[in-house]
Amino acid sequence: MNPNQKIITIGSISLGLVVLNILLHIVSITITVLVLPGNGNNGSCNETVIREYNETVRVEKVTQWHNTNVIEYIERPESDHFMNNTEPLCDVKGFAPFSKDNGIRIGSRGHVFVIREPFVSCSPTECRAFFLTQGSLLNDKHSNGTVKDRSPYRTLMSVEVGQSPNVYQARFEAVAWSATACHDGKRWMTIGVTGPDAKAVAVVHYGGIPTDVINSWAGDILRTQESSCTCIQGECYWVMTDGPANRQAQYKAFKAKQGKIIGQTEISFNGGHIEECSCYPNEGKVECVCRDNWTGANRPVLVISPDLSYRVGYLCAGLPSDTPRGEDSQFTGSCTSPMGNQGYGVKGFGFRQGNDVWMGRTISRTSRSGFEILKVRNGWVQNSKEQIKKQVVVDNLNWSGYSGSFTLPVELTKRNCLVPCFWVEMIRGKPEEKTIWTSSSSIVMCGVDHEIADWSWHDGAILPFDIDKM
C-alpha cells in the first residue's frame, strides 16, 4: 500500500468513527427524551432536591434538569424559639482544644485578612469566629501600619469556628473598630462601633440589617466588649465604655430584643475602671469579668440581672489576673477596690464555679506572652490564694494577647448546663516583632470532665514575611 492509499484509509476510518459518534449521541438524546420521562415520574423532566446544611447562611435548592443542576440559594427559615440560657455553667475539670485557625501561618501564602480582637460566639446550630479586619491582607502593602486600633477600613467579619479569617469564607457583619456579637436563638445580633473618636456610633444589626444605633455620650472613644454579648430568653445584653482609658470613665449596660434597644442603665463605679468585659450567662444572670486599664491588677466583676439591676466590684481572688501585675505573693485581693497599683492592662476573663473561679492570665507578669488558666478555691467570694488547678495553653516563649469567654448552648451539647469556653488571641508583628503589620490568630478551648495536660498551642508563624523585607 503506497503512502497516498494509507492516508485515504486512515481518513476514511476517522470519518467513519466521527459519524458513528454522532449517531450514538442522537440515539442517547432520543432515549432520554422519549423513554426516561415515562419511567415512574409521570412525565416530569425535573426533580427538586433540598440540601440543608448546618449553617445560618443558606440552604441549597437543587433543581435537576436532565444532566444539568440549577442551584438557588434560599434563606434559612427563622427558628421558632429563643434560646433559654438560664442554665448554670457546667462544672469542668479542665479545658480541651476546640479549634485553632492558624491564620498567620496560612496567610504567608493565602488570602487571609489582617485582624485583631478575634472572639467566638455560638448559635443553636454552630459557633462562629468573629474578628476585626484592617481592610487588608497579610503579606500585602496595605498591611503597613495596621498596629493602629481605629481606622475607617476596619470591619467586623466572621467565619465558622476553626477556619482562618480568609476572604473566601468570611461573612461581612458590620463596619467596626470595636464590636460584639451574639445569637438569641433566632438570629445573630452584631454591634459595630465606628466613626471619629469624639462622635463614634455603635450600629446594632439584627439578622444582617441595621436596626438601632447608640451615639457616643461622653465624646471619648465609645467602645464595647470585643467578645460575645449574652442572650437570655430572647433579650441580649452587652456593656459599653465611653471616656478616658487611664482615669475615670463612664459605663453602661444595654438590653435589646430582636435588634431594638429596650433598656439601658448607667453603671456607677467611682474609683474603678471597666473596659472590654468578657461576659457569659449563668443561672439567669449575665456575669462579666472585665479590664481595669486605670490602676487595678485585679479584674472588675459585673453581674447584670434581667431588669438591668447590677452588682459591681472586683474579682475577690488573692491572685492578680491582669497584665502587667506584681508577684502573686505580694498581692492582696479585694472584692471592692482596685489592687496592685498597675496601670494599663489586657482583655481577660473568668468563670464562676460555685464560690470558686477559673481565671485566665498571661504567664508573663509584664508582657503579653504565655497563657494559663487557674482555678482558685473560693476565689469568687474571698481573697483566696489557693490554686486547686492550673493548665498551660501557650508557653511563655510565645506571644499571647487578649482572651475572652463564651458558652456552648444546650441546643448544641444536649446537656442540662452551659459549657464554659474561652479563646486566646496570639498577637504577631508590631510592636514586638520586626514587621510592617500587626495581626493575630487564636486557640479556642472548652470545658470538659477531665484534666488536660499542659501544652503550647502557640501561633507558630515564621516571621518576617516577604512584604517585610522589601
What are these regions (language model features)?
Residues 127-133, 187-192, 235-241, 286-291, ...:
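Short beta-strand elements that form the blades of beta-propeller/WD-repeat-like
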Residues 137-156, 197-203, 246-253, 296-303, ...:
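Structural motif
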Residues 376-381:
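Short loop/turn segments immediately following beta-strands, especially the blade-tip
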Residues 110-119, 173-182, 221-229, 271-279, ...:
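Repeated scaffold domains used in trafficking and secretory/extracellular systems
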Residues 8-40:
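Alpha-helical transmembrane segments in eukaryotic/viral proteins
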Residues 46-80:
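Serine/threonine-rich low-complexity intrinsically disordered regions
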Residues 89, 167-174, 212-219, 262-269, ...:
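Beta-propeller fold detector
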Residues 420-425, 434-470:
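Blade-level signature of beta-propeller repeat domains, shared across WD40, Kelch, NHL, RCC1
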